Each structure stands twice: as C-alpha cells, then as structure tokens.
A protein has these predicted regions:
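Bacterial Sec-dependent N-terminal signal peptides
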Residues: 1-28
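N-terminal maturation segment of proteins
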Residues: 23-591
Length: 591
C-alpha cells in the first residue's frame, strides 16, 4: 500500500484548476473504499483460482501443487466457488454509498460492477458448455473427487484407486470409439472438451505426484494404471482436436474460424462502452478510408507517380534494409521518435522506461500470424531468417521497410505499449479494467497525433503512415463483416491486398491472426476505434486549452487502463450514475 499512498503530482493547469481531476486531497488514491474492495477481490480471485486449479511438478507449483491463475474450465466445484465469490462482492459493492464517492471511484464502481456482472454471465455460459460436453467425460467426477481429498492429504485406498483408474481408461477408449462416428460437434464444444480433458490430466497428475514414492501402497498399485490413464486422456484429447481439423474451410484460404454473429458483437460493444452499432463502425471506417485515399494521392503525386498510389507504395516497400540490418534501423527510428516527443514536450518519459526496453527477433513460425513487429516490454522484430522461402523472405522485408516501420515504432515502444506497461505497473495498480480499446487505441492515437504534428519527413513517410491508417480501417471493415457472416476469410485477405496494398503472405497472416486462436472478435477494430476516442478527447481538452498535450497524456497514463469513455468521465467530470449506460458519440458519422 505504500505506493498507493504516494501523492500523484499530476496536473498544474495553466493558472486555473481543473476540478474534474484534482478532486481529492490524495490524487493517487481517489478514495479508500473502491481501491480496497478491488484489491481484496483481486487477491481472493487469484488465490481461489490457484487453489482450485491443480498442477503437476512439470507445469509449476511443485509436486501435487496448485495451478497458475486460470479462470477457464475446471471442476464444477471450482465454478461454484467462484460464483459465490462474485455474489459476495456484488453484495459488498451494493452496500456502498455511490453518491458519496469521488468521481474516479464512481468510475471504479461502475466498471467493477460491470465486470462482476460479466463474470457471472460468463460463468453461466461456461457451466452450460460444460454440461453440453459432460456426457463425453462421465468419469470426471471420480477424478475430481480424488483430487479434492488429495488437497488435504487424506491417504487413499491405493488398490481402489488403481481399479478405478483402470476402469476409467477402458471407459475413455469406449467413448473415443463413439466420438469417431459423431457428427456436428461445434468448435466451441471441441475447445471445451479438450480444455476439460487437460484439466482432468492435471488433476490425476496432481494426485499421482503427491502420493507416488511417499505412500508405499500407492507406489506399488498405481503407477501403471496412472500411465495408461494419462495416455488415454492424451489420445482422447487428440481425437477431439481432430474433429476441428476435419472441419472444412469455407474457401481456399484454409482458415477455419467461427463468426460470432451480430448480436454478440453488439453485446461486446456495449460491454466495451462503444456506443455505435457494427454498421456505424463500418461507416466510420469508410469515412477514414476516404480521407486516407485523398492523402495517399497527394503523397503519390509528390513522389511523381501521378494517381498510381500502388506504384508509389511499391517504391516505398522496396526501400527495405539488407538482412541483418533491421535491428539497427529500428533503433534509429526509435531515437527519431523519442527525440520528436521530447522536442514537442508531449509526454513525460521516465528515464528508467527509456533504459530498460529490449529487442527480440520474431521466430519464423510466429511470423505466420505476426508478420510485423510487436511491442511491450520488448520490441519483437519480424524479418526473414535463413529457413524461410525466398518469396516469404522478400515479403517480410518489403512489409517491414523503414517508412512502414517509422510510422509504428512509437506505437510499440514510447509512448505506446512499452510506456503503457511501465506506467500501469506503477499507477492505480488496483485497476484491472484492461481493454484493447485503451491499449491498442492509445498506441494508434499517437499515429494520428504525430501526423498532425508533421512527424513524417517526406511523402515516403506519409505513405508509410497512411498504409497503417488504411490497414486499421480495413481491420474494422473485414473483421465486422466476417463476424456478421457477410465475408469469408479469403475475401478478407483479398480486401487487404487490393484495398490496402498488403503483401499477400502478410495479409494471410493478418487474417489468420484475427480469426484463428480465439482472438476476441472486437480486438482488431479496437485500434482505430480506440484511437479516435483518445483523439476526440484530446480535441475536447487540449483543443480547448483546458490542458496541455503533456498534461493530457500524463493524466491518461496515470489513470491506468479502462474504457476511454470512463477516462473522459474522470477528466471532464461527466455526471455518473450507478446504472450508467454508454452514450458518448466521439465520431461524427457521415450521414
């Protein structure tokens, strides 16, 4: 708590106080009730998940230990206990006097209640999904019951355990035979089944590691039945996964995803406090695209290519640096961007943050889904390796040319993802309201702001920045159309190639990343949508002289992650009620 008691020196508002943010004598802890409640919940949540998630020695936690935090599938006992936790904290929250809270703590109340309600809904959904696949794991209760008594060290009847696990192994093989002929198992059911089987493997492994070698009778009776059970569970999981592999792609892309549908998109947008429909977001993206088109033609003409923007883009792509030179090029671009931020006095950059960011190289297999560099504590650089095919090497180099990279190094490092991570670990650390609309939106916002501040040095740099702006427009359009069932993955790939100018391999990687691996449906549209939220708030506060650039940017970083509408509510002192509903229209639609 010592860090939470330090006073935050945040705003000195050019001769006038800005009551919306300097509302308490202790700016770092805006009140005691909400930080304490959320910290206690987070601690309770972590310890319960740890206790009710089994693990084995080779997955952490020691022999027969507890698992890493994982709120996903698990035993019915685990879900029931978490449900009691949620209900208990909802009661504690409702006992607070909302109207007596400070503005920041009202925002915390609203967001914490939102998240508790969401956890209750998701828990009910997970219980239904588990019930759906429970007939395929009728032996689960026996394994979980033994793991439960293991937690308190009860000595088992070793001969009984051996017989039980032998019988379960036979049962699994019978079920696997039935599964082979089963038709119509959904990808969600396959995921639930494989995760449940993995949890059962951990539960059985936890029991075995706890007693084996320590309990003489267990050590004599159980090792062989355990090995056979573990192998059977592994094979059973693989059989479920093969049901997904058998699912045919809808087109030649080979990408098998699962559109969530418009209704679920609307529900998630409401949760993220985005007050636009999917169709309205597509309209916004098209309006942004039109602006990009006009600016791209200006830069193309300046480069001497008339109206042939794709020819200008090709020239920019071919400015790539030789193999082995990309890390040096990234460092040069980083220094240019940080020097620009400091010269314009745009944001406070802690010296330690500048000192400790690192570099990594992206493995070639990861470049299939991350064809460009990524950021965070380190910047991970995508560039070709000796193991890649010639075409893939050239596409990687062309797609990561200096003008493309110059537009986004600040997105990944300072003042983007690296600074976000650095500051979130130091300010308002009790908040756990992370959202891609804040995380990706903030980093994208800097691309918009630096364009306005003439960061690009010439038409090639402008084309690099416009390429990424168009890319983010395209993400909104293709991801929403896909999840509403209107586009196939191949149509999304073709759209990126034809409309944005992507290398085809990079476009395939982008679409695969978006739809495979259970990426959240709204993630890809969060970049430009969140960026426009921060841009609109900048116009509202900095554009009107209420804050300087530095004050605004520092304030956002000190608040920690949350929906941008709540950042606005805090910084502009918007009226907040317990039953708050999203309503902020941060972008003027074209109609």
């Amino acid at each position: 708590m010592t860090r939470l008691l330090r006073r935050l020196m945040l705003l000195s508002f050019l001769g006038h106080s800005f009551a919306s943010f300097s509302q308490s004598n202790n700016d770092y802890v805006p009140c005691q009730e909400m930080p304490n409640l959320m910290q206690n919940f987070n601690a309770d949540y972590r310890i319960l998940i740890r206790f009710y998630t089994p693990t084995t020695g080779n997955t952490g936690g020691g022999r027969g230990g507890f698992g890493a935090p994982d709120a996903g599938v698990g035993s019915p006992e685990k879900r029931e206990r978490l449900g009691k936790l949620y209900a208990g904290y909802i009661q504690k929250l409702e006992a607070l006097n909302f109207n007596s809270l400070s503005q920041e703590c009202k925002a915390d109340y609203i967001l914490f209640k939102r998240d508790l309600d969401e956890k209750v809904k998701l828990a009910a959904k997970e219980a239904a999904e588990y019930a759906n696949i429970k007939p395929w794991i009728p032996f689960a209760e026996k394994i979980y019951a033994l793991e439960k008594t293991r937690r308190r060290g009860k000595q088992p009847d070793a001969q009984k355990v051996a017989k039980e696990w032998f019988d379960i192994t036979k049962e699994i093989k019978t079920m696997q035979g039935k599964l082979k002929d089963e038709k119509g198992i959904s990808p969600d059911a396959v995921f639930e089944a494989t995760e449940s089987i993995a949890d059962l493997k951990k539960a059985a492994g936890s029991v075995f590691e706890f007693y084996n070698g320590y309990d003489p009778m267990f050590t004599w009776w159980v090792p062989k039945p355990y090995k056979e059970l573990d192998d059977a569970l592994t094979a059973y999981s693989a059989a479920f996964k093969s049901k997904t592999a058998d699912t045919k792609a809808v087109d030649k892309s080979g990408i098998v995803g699962q559109p969530v549908g418009r209704e679920e998109l609307v529900r998630q947008l409401n949760y993220e406090m985005i007050s636009y429909t999917p169709e309205e977001l597509i309209e916004i993206a098209n309006k942004e695209f039109a602006w990009c088109d006009a600016e791209m033609l200006k830069a193309t003409k300046e480069m001497g290519f008339g109206t042939d923007w794709k020819a200008a883009l090709e020239k920019v792509k071919n400015t790539y640096v030789p193999a082995g030179k990309q890390p040096e090029a990234i460092l040069k671009l980083y220094n240019e961007s940080v020097d620009f931020l400091k010269k314009k006095d745009l944001i406070t950059l802690p010296p330690l943050a500048e000192e400790v960011w690192g570099m990594r190289m992206m493995p070639p297999e990861n470049q299939l889904v991350n064809p460009f560099f990524t950021g965070g504590a380190d910047i991970t650089i995508s560039y070709p390796t000796n193991t890649m095919d010639e075409d893939d090497r050239l596409m990687s180099m062309r797609g990561n040319n200096p003008h493309f990279s110059r537009a986004t190094v600040h997105h990944e490092l300072l003042a983007g993802h690296n600074l976000q991570q650095f500051m979130n670990q130091r300010y308002r650390t009790y908040r756990t309201f992370g959202t891609p609309f804040w995380t990706e939106g903030w980093s994208l916002y800097w691309e918009l702001l630096l364009w306005d501040l003439d960061f690009p040095q010439g038409p090639e740099d402008k084309i690099g920045m416009l390429f990424w702006h168009m890319h983010r427009c395209a993400r909104i359009i293709f991801s929403l159309n896909y999840h509403m069932g209107k586009w196939t993955p191949q149509e999304c790939i073709d759209f990126l190639v034809d409309r944005v100018g992507h290398e085809r391999a990079n476009a395939e990687g982008e679409v695969r990343r978006s739809f495979v691996g259970r990426y959240p449906p709204l993630y890809q549209l969060a970049y430009l949508t969140g960026g426009r939220q921060f841009y609109a708030l900048h116009k509202e506060l900095v554009g009107t002289g209420k804050m300087t650039n530095k004050q605004y940017h520092d304030a956002v970083m000190h608040l920690n992650a949350m929906p941008v509408e709540m950042v606005r509510a805090i910084l502009t002192n918007q009226k907040l009620t317990k039953d708050f509903k999203t309503s902020w229209k941060f972008y003027k639609l074209p109609f």
